[in-house]
Amino acid sequence: MNGLGGLNKSEHGVGIGLVQLQLPVTVTPQDLARQTQVIVDLVAKARRNQPGMDLVVFPEYALHGLSMDINPDIMCRMDGPEVAAFKAACKQNRIWGCFSIMEYNPGGMPYNSGIIIDDTGALKLYYRKMHPWVPVEPWEPGDLGIPVIDGPKGAKLALIICHDGMFPEMARECAYKGAEIMIRTAGYTAPIRESWRFTNQSNAFCNLMVTANVCMCGSDGTFDSMGEGMICNFDGSIIAHGTSGRVNEIITAEVRPDLVREARLGWGVENNIYQLGHRGYVAVAGGAQDAPYTYMHDLAAGRYRLPWEVEVKITDGTACGFEKPTRLYGKPAKSAAE
């Protein structure tokens, strides 16, 4: 059930709109300013489209396109004009918004960041992509963790970006911290279509969590993005799915975070987010509450290493034209983003 794309709002429903934004080409500060206005105008379109919409979501790369340009002249800052324009648009249209920026980083490569702004224009969530799509993307690994916030109607929201969603641990972290709706923004192109679809569904089902997911759309003359706005219910079923590939179409649905809460408390079979920490609770009181997974221990101890580690062929970005890095994670480099 999606309330006819959110046209029929229930008492506890949250209306979500996913903008399958036309893929832009952004080279200059003037291009950046024009694309900012495009997004601002689409916030207003979303409000006109559905007066009951609570949250409008724009894809990753909505401002900058897919060029991977790290020119500091077109990088954004949290106190810059682009974020200010998004805040004003949300306040003026009385709607929550999720936006993508490539963020200037004086100590390294730019961050691929996402923000959520409420309907008063206040910044509520600030996230930096944790898993850049290597070896293609040059972005600095995110360092803010995964925040979870109180969103529209009190729904618990989390945001991850594109390739993040290919790691089951990311969706699990969102749910473990309480997220009832996980937003996933992306710039993926057509070769990733099937992987995109089944991970959106599995991220929902494995965590009893709604997922709201959207890519860029259309062509920039080089790349072809796919749109594929997709909202999945907490049981993994698809509530809404944009399959037309039509640019700037807004895929809409109502979701029910109250039913997510009910399922997490009331489900027995396939309550996987609970059962992970309570293995075999029929046999032993409270279930086994150990951590039997080797990779978890190794990752936490800084010794994550695959049996075939030394044979992995692609371990930096040189194949995609980037210089081999010498700086370690967490160490600043004055000129890395210049």
Swiss-Prot record:
Class in the EC hierarchy, top level: hydrolase
Covalent S-S links between cysteines: none
Keyword field: Hydrolase
One example GO MF annotation: formamidase activity
Catalytic residue list: 60, 129, 162
Domain of life: Bacteria
EC number: 3.5.1.49
InterPro entries attached to this UniProt entry: Aliph_Amidase/BUP, C-N_Hydrolase, C-N_Hydrolase_sf, Formamidase
GO biological process: putrescine biosynthetic process from arginine
Catalytic reactions of this protein: formamide + H2O = formate + NH4(+)
Cross-referenced PROSITE patterns: CN_HYDROLASE (PS50263)
Record domain CN hydrolase: where: 14-257
Pfam families for the chain: CN_hydrolase (PF00795)
NCBIfam families: PRK13287.1 (NF009803)
Family matches, as HAMAP family: Formamidase
Family in the record: Belongs to the carbon-nitrogen hydrolase superfamily. Aliphatic amidase family.
Protein task: Is an aliphatic amidase with a restricted substrate specificity, as it only hydrolyzes formamide.
Protein name from the UniProt record: Formamidase
Taxonomy of the source species: Bacteria, Pseudomonadati, Pseudomonadota, Alphaproteobacteria, Hyphomicrobiales
